[in-house]
């Protein structure tokens, strides 16, 4: 059944006051509860001291993440297989194949792009600082790649990083809830790489840096991601 109709039928059947509270209002919210009777904006919360403001974003631009990827008819693209850690050449293309910026960020994960971004990040993020960093990846495999590259690039610039300082925290990680507990309460991990697990429902006041290495067209999801550090 349609979830909106399902919720409406329940709210109309029971004789009780219904109060809805949400930080990310969407169309289905007003369909169920009607127009909001009270709103408390992000800016008001910042002024009142309940939230903190964020600085302007630092954008790392490359040719790939601004122009996308385009292969011409007859070319043989090379792809990376994370399961075998090898690069394979595809069959000759019968038609032109183009990935726009959104598709690139979601599905086309290239080693040079990731390494370029990580090389820039390690200049600004101290893996032993009291300030914590949360990185949003496009997929679980992408998260693994980011973790490995972080260790490699810190080593390349002569920064010694404890093994527990950088962790992937996703649903596929071993004992993810314990990792969340450590991230919230202990010094390490200092840098966490996630996909969706830490998007909502987690409050880690020490998070100071948010790094978004994925694309989203969802305003609600973006606000939830931004809320991890505000």
Name each model feature, range by range.
Residues 1-17, 27-28:
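Short, conserved "post-DEAD/DEAH" coupling segment immediately C-terminal to helicase motif II
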Residues 2-9, 32, 41, 45, ...:
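Alpha-helical scaffold elements adjacent to nucleotide-binding pockets in ATP/GTP-utilizing enzyme cores
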Residues 13-17, 35, 48-54, 130, ...:
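Short glycine-/polar-rich loops that comprise or flank the Walker A/P-loop
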Residues 16-22, 192-193:
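Structural recognition of the conserved hydrophobic beta-strand(s) that form the central parallel beta-sheet
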Residues 23-28, 60-65, 140-142, 173-174, ...:
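Conserved nucleotide-binding/hydrolysis micro-motifs of P-loop NTPases
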Residues 30-130:
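Interdomain helical connector at the RecA1-RecA2 junction of SF1/SF2 helicase-like NTPases
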Residues 85-88, 96-194:
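Conserved C-terminal RecA-like helicase domain
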Residues 165-230:
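Conserved RecA-like P-loop NTPase helicase motor core
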